[in-house]
Regions:
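Gly/Ser-rich catalytic/binding loops embedded in alpha/beta enzyme cores
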Residues: 2-113
């Protein structure tokens, strides 16, 4: 299945209806990043392991039957100016190389809810 051209609403619906898992979606995106990143250089930081861990958590949570947010299980890319506790927030400068935040910014928490 080529999910690249599907709108986010369709991806979310397929995840809710168990036609697609977060792991499958993330594996697809990882394959595309692996294929094109050396030429595009779009990522300041990319952690495949963390992405797949979060996808596994999302799929497990979905199976529990508990209420989910509309974007549950959909991976979201953030600019490195958005504060996160589990990824570097370097703001595009070597002065902040490897710096992380003690907590997520409000927008990150909203996206995760």
């Amino acid at each position: 299945m080529n999910v690249f051209s599907l709108p986010i609403s369709e991806l979310a619906e397929r995840i809710r209806n168990s036609q697609l898992t977060s792991i499958e979606l993330c594996e697809y995106y990882i394959s595309q990043i692996d294929k094109f990143e050396k030429d595009v250089k779009a990522w300041a930081y990319f952690d495949k392991k963390l992405l797949l861990e979060k996808a596994t958590e999302a799929d497990t949570y979905r199976k529990s039957g508990k209420p989910m947010g509309l974007l549950h299980g959909i991976p979201v890319a953030l600019k490195d100016i958005i504060g996160t506790y589990d990824m570097p927030t370097e703001c595009g400068t070597v002065l902040r190389k490897g710096k992380t935040q003690s907590q997520n910014s409000e927008i990150v928490d909203l996206l995760k809810s």
